[in-house]
């Protein structure tokens, strides 16, 4: 319930929320995902790779082992495994976990039975739908209204690196605007 006065604002939210905050119809299409986390006695891979499912079948899109990058990401003495399913938001947690375990068993064998499910996250707007033409991610940010900037991957190419670049562009534009218009 507090109002703050400022000269510039950066909306760093997903596309539908940005549209809502700007008072525009939230008609932005996006792709949802499920992300399941497991703790395992031993990592299934020992390298910091993103494993993509190239089979064209199954529910799993990708798998990573974040604890290979930083052991502190996992519970003490265990490995942290992250499994992503694109779409499949209609699956309840138990069904999703069962389907993932079945598929992981085909990939890594019965060792998967010893993995402990930690949590399932449902990310409604994980990736924006971006039919061509896709905006150039290297173009500097411009205000959508005086003093209001937006950033996020829906502004350019889907992916965390482009979301971060979009944020940098918005920050640089705000710094420039504030330097040019003292106030």
Residue ranges and their predicted role:
Residues 71-183:
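Conserved flavin/dinucleotide-binding core of flavoenzymes
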Residues 1-98, 102-107:
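Mid-domain catalytic core of redox enzymes
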């Amino acid at each position: 319930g507090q109002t703050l006065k400022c000269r510039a604002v950066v909306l760093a939210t997903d596309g539908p929320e940005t549209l809502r905050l700007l008072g525009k119809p939230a008609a932005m299409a996006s792709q949802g995902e499920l992300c399941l986390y497991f703790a395992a006695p031993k990592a299934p891979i020992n390298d910091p790779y993103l494993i993509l499912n190239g089979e064209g079948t199954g529910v799993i899109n990708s798998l990573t082992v974040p604890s290979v990058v930083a052991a502190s990401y996992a519970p003490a003495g265990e490995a942290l495994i992250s499994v992503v399913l694109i779409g499949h938001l209609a699956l309840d947690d138990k069904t999703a976990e069962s389907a993932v375990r079945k598929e992981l068993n085909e990939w890594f064998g019965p060792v998967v039975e010893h993995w402990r499910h930690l949590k399932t996250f449902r990310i409604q707007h994980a990736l924006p739908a971006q039919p061509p033409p896709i905006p150039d991610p290297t173009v500097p940010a411009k205000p959508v209204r005086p003093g209001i900037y937006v950033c996020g991957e829906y502004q350019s190419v889907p992916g965390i690196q482009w979301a971060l670049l979009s944020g940098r562009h918005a920050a640089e534009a705000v710094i420039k605007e504030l330097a040019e218009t003292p106030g």
